[in-house]
A protein has these predicted regions:
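Catalytic loop of short-chain dehydrogenase/reductase
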Residues: 69-155, 167-169
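A conserved structural motif in NAD(P)-dependent oxidoreductases
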Residues: 191-199
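Nucleotide-sugar donor-binding loop of glycosyltransferases
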Residues: 7, 164, 169
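Short-chain dehydrogenase/reductase
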Residues: 1-66, 70-85, 174-175
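A glycine/serine/threonine-rich, flexible loop-to-helix segment
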Residues: 17, 134, 155, 167-191
Length: 199
């Protein structure tokens, strides 16, 4: 399968993203295209649609994966109360933009029977935790978005689901809490295989 993706990386992290893109290209005969742009931005999405269609060359999107880990990691109240624009941004980026991507791909006849839509969720969708207020709300919203997509598009043979892979030691995890390493260790203890998901 070819892979089309977006990432939003700056500075030294950008080099890691380029390296990963090269690794992926070496595995799938160079059938890969990534843009270092904000996938949650409507203008970016619309501006890439014609290029996506050209890359697909009359093909269709087999899998739409929503894996955007960018939101406000704070509490609702103390010590740093969340602001409305932070909540709105987190909701849009981590949940609502999947609706607009799905709509746009449908409008461009790029999703068909057999297409799959996946979103990555977390236990924060049903469990309160330090510094996870806005993201937890967004994860619960993402699950509701995916349920509704599945209900509306199921008759077209398009399925939608979320995956809760558990604690995964990524750069995004380190931004959520200074105690992220403790989270990883606790997760290993309760996992029968004594491990966590690897990125």
């Amino acid at each position: 399968y070819g892979i089309i993706g977006f990432h939003l990386d700056r500075g030294s992290i950008k080099k890691d993203a380029v390296k990963l893109q090269e690794e992926i290209a070496s595995l799938n005969n160079n059938r890969v295209k990534f843009w270092n742009e904000n996938a949650a931005d409507k203008e970016v999405m619309l501006s890439k649609m014609e290029e996506i269609k050209t890359i697909l060359d009359n093909g269709k999107v087999k899998l739409l994966m929503h894996s955007i880990a960018f939101g406000s990691t704070t509490n609702f109240f103390n010590p740093t109360p969340v602001r409305q624009r932070q909540m709105d941004m987190t909701q849009h980026v981590m949940a609502h933009c999947l609706i607009y991507w799905t709509q746009t791909l449908l409008e461009n006849n790029l999703l068909i029977a057999g297409s799959r839509i996946l979103g990555l969720t977390s236990e924060g969708s049903y469990k309160a935790m330090e510094g996870y207020g806005p993201v937890g709300v967004a994860k619960a919203s993402l699950e509701a978005v995916v349920r509704q997509i599945g209900w509306e598009l199921g008759s077209k043979g398009i399925t939608a689901n979320t995956i809760q892979a558990g604690i995964t030691p990524t750069r995004a995890l380190t931004k959520i809490s200074k105690d992220w390493e403790d989270w990883v260790e606790r997760t290993k203890k309760r996992n029968p295989m004594k491990r966590v998901t690897t990125p």
